[in-house]
């Protein structure tokens, strides 16, 4: 069996890394879109090393989980994450949707561009997922031995995982890019 915990909410560097990996955005493009989202009141300040969420943000994330995914995906108490960077700039909390209730990505104002919408969706999903239950499943291994005339036995091994409870992965797939994530949901 395996248990997989969600990643913490975004810091500046993790947002840039994930936007590059999932959205193919350069760091400058990510920060431009984040700046616009911040200036329009959709996200918190985007220059931070902190992974902590305020109590208000934890409550908003839990409300999002209950509404979008169901109470069975919500842990008994909010998750907390410690910042690993020494001398971290923790005056600001993690990058997250702003406000007492997180705006759904479909409800962003019409004047937000495509980059802003994509980046906000990434932030919204990661913040929600950071407060969801662990994903759980089983590891499987299959080995096949085949006899060959010239080289003796040949051994083939395949490993994989099955999912018993998707947990946070319903909201945010960490190890796949967007096209793989969409295929996984289908």
Residue ranges of model-derived segments:
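Extended, well-ordered alpha-helical scaffold/bundle regions in very large, multi-domain proteins
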Residues: 25-89, 95
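GHKL/Bergerat-fold ATPase module in large chromosome/replication-associated machines
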Residues: 97-100
